C-alpha cells in the first residue's frame, strides 16, 4: 500500500475516533444532522416520485390549487380564462381540475398559452400544473382465448380445459363449483401442523367467524362488472367511481379483446359470494366490494390522486395491481397530487386510523427489474405484496426488493396452477396471474383482520402482517435473520400471509405508539465512485435523541436511504444498506436494460428488513459501480421511521432502552462508566482496523 493510500485509509478510520470522542462529550452525533421543521417540503421523504426522463404526453387538463378551496372562486377563475372547471380532484380539497377545450386533448408539447400564464399569476392560485399522461401497467401477464356458447360463457386454457359458469357441479362447504380447485385456500385443510401447510389458512379465520363483514374494499383498476352474479350482492356503490368518465358507474368498457377484465378478476378474489353455486369463493366473502375505474384512459397525477383518495373515510382497503412499467429501466412513482392523497389517506382516512393501501410488487423479473424503482411499492404507506408459485418457488416474473412486506400465492411456470376468480360477462376463469392476483388475496386477508379488530391503524396492520407471515415452504436463496430474529427475504418479504394467525393476533392487538421520524444527513457531498469499485459510507445514528420528541426513534419500522447520484449508466449501480444489527438490505440491483444517464434525484430507497431493530448505531451505505466510467454520489440521508418504545408481541409499547440509558446516565455514575467503556472499545476497534 502506498503512503498516500495508507494515509487516506487512516483518515477514514480517524473520523470514527473523532465521532467516539464527540459521543463521550455528549455532543450530537458526527456524520449526521437533525433536520429542523423549516426544511420540510413536499418533495421526497415517504414516497419517491422522480421519474426517468421520457417522451411526455401532455393533456389539455390542469390541476389548480385554489386558496381556501372555494368552488365559487374556482368557477370564477375558470370562466375568466376560458377553462371548464371539472370540479375538485378530491372532494373537500383545494385542488381543482380545469380543462382547456381550445387545446388538443393530447400533445407532445407542453402548452405555453397566455391564459395559462395569467391564471398562474392570480392571487388565489397557489399552484398549477398541466397534467401528463403516465404509462401505467396492469400486473397480470398472460393473454387468453375467449369463446362463447348459446347459454354459457367460458374461457379456454392453452391445454383446452374449459371452465363454465353453469351450476352443474355441487361441492359441500361451500358448494361453489370451483372451490375444490382453489388450492391456495384449501390444500392445507388436512394438515394440522401450521408450519407445513401450503395455503393461506383462511378456513381457520372463517371458522372463527370472520368473513370480512362490515369491511369495505375497493379495487383501483380498469372497472368492475358490478352485475356479475358472484359479485353483485356485495357490490357497494359508495366505494365505487368512474374517474375516467367522471360518473358513479365503474362498469368496464367492453371490447372484443376483453382487455378490461382485470378489475373484475381482482374483485372476485376478495369478495365473491360464498355457497351460491357459482364460480369461486372470495377470501372476505361478506365484505363490501367497490371498484374505481381509472386505468381505461389517460392516467394522470389527478386521476391517480382522485382514485387513491376516493371516499377515504368510508373505504377501508384500496387494492392496486398496477404501477409503472416493469421493463427494467423505468424509475417512476406518484407525483405531487397523488403523494398528497396518500398522505391524507394515511393521516385522515378511516376516521384517522389510516387507509390501507395494498399494492402488487411488480412483474419485471424477466427484465431484472427492481420494485424499489417503483415509487408505489417502495412507499412506507403501501403494503407491498409479492408472489409465490404453488410449489413455493420464486415466479419467473417476480421482482426482488427490500420494500416487499409479504407474499401470497399466484401463478408460476408452465404446469403450475394459477388463481381462480370471476371474469367479464358473468364468467369464471382459472387463469388470473402475476402479482396482479397476489395483491387482492392480501386485501381479502387484511379485510378478515380488520373485521376482527376494526380499530387497527395502517401501521398496526403492517406489524401484524410481519409477525404472522410464514417463511416455511418458500424457497429463496437469500433468507436471512434480522436483528430481532425474524426471517426475511427480498423475494418474499417476511413470508406467506396467514389469515388465521392474523385474525387471532388482531383480536388482542394493542395500538402501537404514534410514528416518529428521524432524518439524518451524511455530512459531505460529491463522493466519487470509480468504475469497478465500491463506495462505502458510514453514518452514525443516535435515533435523533438530541432533537424533538416526535423525532426520537429507538425501534425502527421502515428505513429509507434518500439518494441523489449521477451515473453514465444507471443500471450498472448496486446499492446496499447495513443496519447496526448487521442486517444487509439490497436497495438496488443491477438492471442491464437501464441505460439512463439520469441517475437518481432524491430517490427514497426503502427497506422493511430492519423492522423491530434498534435505531442507534452505525449504518453503512455501499454503492457498487460496475460500469465503464465513474459515478458520483451527490448526497444521501438516512430516514428512520418507528417508535421511541418497543412494540410488544401483542402490540402496545415497552420502555425505550435509549430512554432508560439516558435516565441511568443522569442519575448514576454507572451509566457514564458504561459510555466510557463503549467509547474506549470503539477507539480500540478503530485503531485495530487502521493497523490491519
UniProtKB/Swiss-Prot annotation:
Molecular-function GO term, any one: serine-type endopeptidase activity
Protein keywords: Calcium, Cell membrane, Cell projection, Cleavage on pair of basic residues, Disulfide bond, Glycoprotein, Hydrolase, Membrane, Metal-binding, Protease, Serine protease, Signal, Transmembrane, Transmembrane helix, Zymogen
Enzyme Commission number(s) from the entry: 3.4.21.-
Lumenal topological domain residue ranges: 140-670
Impact upon substituting residue 265 to W: In dz185; increased secondary dendritic branches in PVD neurons
P/Homo B domain sequence ranges: 512-646
Protein family according to the UniProt entry: Belongs to the peptidase S8 family. Furin subfamily.
Protein name, per record: Furin-like protease kpc-1
Organism for this UniProt entry: Caenorhabditis elegans
Amino acid at each position: 500500500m502506498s503512503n498516500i493510500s495508507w494515509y487516506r485509509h487512516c483518515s477514514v478510520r480517524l473520523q470514527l475516533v473523532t465521532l467516539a470522542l464527540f459521543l463521550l462529550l455528549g455532543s450530537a452525533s458526527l456524520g449526521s444532522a437533525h433536520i429542523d421543521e423549516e426544511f420540510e417540503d413536499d418533495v421526497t421523504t415517504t414516497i419517491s416520485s422522480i421519474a426517468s426522463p421520457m417522451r411526455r404526453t401532455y393533456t389539455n387538463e390542469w390541476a389548480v390549487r385554489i386558496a381556501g378551496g372555494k368552488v365559487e372562486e374556482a368557477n370564477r377563475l375558470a370562466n375568466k380564462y376560458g377553462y371548464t372547471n371539472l370540479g375538485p380532484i378530491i372532494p373537500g380539497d383545494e385542488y381543482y381540475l380545469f380543462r382547456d377545450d381550445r387545446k388538443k386533448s393530447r400533445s407532445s408539447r407542453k402548452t405555453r398559452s397566455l391564459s395559462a400564464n395569467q391564471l398562474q399569476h392570480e392571487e388565489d392560485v397557489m399552484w398549477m400544473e398541466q397534467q401528463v399522461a403516465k404509462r401505467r401497467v396492469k400486473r397480470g401477464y398472460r393473454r387468453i382465448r375467449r369463446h362463447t356458447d348459446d347459454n354459457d360463457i367460458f374461457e379456454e386454457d392453452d391445454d383446452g380445459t374449459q371452465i363454465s359458469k353453469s351450476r352443474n357441479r355441487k361441492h359441500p362447504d361451500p358448494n361453489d363449483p370451483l372451490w375444490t380447485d382453489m388450492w391456495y385456500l384449501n390444500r392445507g385443510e388436512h394438515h394440522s401442523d401450521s408450519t407445513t401447510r401450503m395455503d393461506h389458512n383462511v378456513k381457520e379465520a372463517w371458522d372463527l367467524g370472520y368473513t370480512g363483514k362490515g369491511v369495505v374494499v375497493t379495487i383501483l383498476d380498469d372497472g368492475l362488472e358490478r352485475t356479475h352474479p358472484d359479485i353483485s350482492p356485495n357490490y357497494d356503490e359508495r366505494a365505487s367511481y368512474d374517474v375516467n368518465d367522471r360518473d358513479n358507474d365503474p362498469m368496464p368498457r367492453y371490447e372484443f379483446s376483453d382487455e378490461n377484465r382485470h378489475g373484475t378478476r381482482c374483485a372476485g378474489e376478495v369478495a365473491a359470494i360464498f355457497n351460491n353455486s357459482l364460480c369461486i369463493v372470495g377470501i372476505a366473502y361478506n365484505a363490501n366490494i367497490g371498484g374505481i375505474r381509472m386505468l381505461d384512459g389517460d392516467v394522470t397525477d389527478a386521476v391517480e390522486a382522485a382514485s387513491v383518495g376516493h371516499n377515504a373515510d368510508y373505504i377501508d382497503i384500496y387494492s392496486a395491481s398496477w404501477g409503472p412499467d416493469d421493463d427494467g429501466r423505468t424509475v417512476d412513482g406518484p407525483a405531487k397530487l397523488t403523494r398528497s392523497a396518500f398522505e391524507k389517506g394515511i393521516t385522515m382516512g378511516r376516521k384517522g386510523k389510516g387507509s390501507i393501501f395494498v399494492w402488487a410488487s411488480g412483474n419485471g423479473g424477466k427484465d431484472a427489474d427492481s420494485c424499489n424503482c417503483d415509487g408505489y411499492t417502495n412507499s412506507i404507506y403501501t403494503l407491498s405484496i409479492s408472489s409465490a408459485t404453488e410449489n413455493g418457488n420464486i415466479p419467473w416474473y417476480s421482482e426482488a426488493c427490500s420494500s416487499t412486506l409479504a407474499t401470497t400465492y399466484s401463478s408460476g411456470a408452465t404446469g403450475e396452477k394459477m388463481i381462480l376468480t370471476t371474469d367479464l360477462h358473468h364468467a369464471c376463469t382459472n387463469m388470473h396471474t402475476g402479482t396482479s392476483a397476489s395483491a387482492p388475496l392480501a386485501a381479502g386477508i387484511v379485510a378478515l383482520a380488520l373485521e376482527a379488530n376494526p380499530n387497527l391503524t395502517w401501521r398496526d396492520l403492517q406489524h401484524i402482517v410481519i409477525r404472522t407471515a410464514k417463511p416455511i415452504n418458500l424457497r429463496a436463496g437469500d433468507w436471512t435473520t434480522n436483528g430481532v430474529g425474524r426471517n426475511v427475504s427480498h423475494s418474499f418479504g417476511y413470508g406467506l400471509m396467514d389469515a388465521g394467525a392474523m385474525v387471532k393476533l388482531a383480536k388482542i392487538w394493542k395500538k402501537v405508539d404514534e410514528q416518529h421520524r428521524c432524518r439524518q444527513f451524511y455530512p459531505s457531498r460529491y463522493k466519487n465512485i470509480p468504475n469497478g469499485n465500491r463506495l462505502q459510507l458510514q453514518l452514525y445514528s443516535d435515533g435523533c435523541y438530541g432533537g424533538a420528541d416526535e423525532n426520537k426513534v429507538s425501534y425502527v419500522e421502515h428505513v429509507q436511504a434518500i439518494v441523489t447520484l449521477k451515473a453514465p449508466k444507471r443500471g450498472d449501480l448496486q446499492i446496499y444498506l447495513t443496519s447496526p444489527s448487521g442486517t444487509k438490505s439490497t436497495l438496488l440491483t443491477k438492471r442491464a436494460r437501464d441505460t439512463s444517464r439520469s441517475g437518481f434525484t432524491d430517490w427514497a430507497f426503502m427497506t422493511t428488513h430492519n423492522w423491530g431493530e434498534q435505531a442507534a448505531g452505525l449504518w453503512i451505505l455501499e454503492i457498487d459501480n460496475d460500469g465503464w466510467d465513474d459515478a458520483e454520489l451527490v448526497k444521501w440521508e438516512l430516514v428512520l421511521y418507528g417508535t421511541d418504545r418497543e412494540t410488544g408481541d401483542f402490540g402496545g409499547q415497552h420502555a425505550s432502552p435509549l430512554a432508560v440509558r439516558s435516565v441511568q446516565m443522569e442519575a448514576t455514575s454507572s451509566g457514564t462508566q458504561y459510555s466510557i467503556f463503549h467509547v474506549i472499545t470503539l477507539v480500540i476497534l478503530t485503531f485495530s482496523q487502521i493497523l490491519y
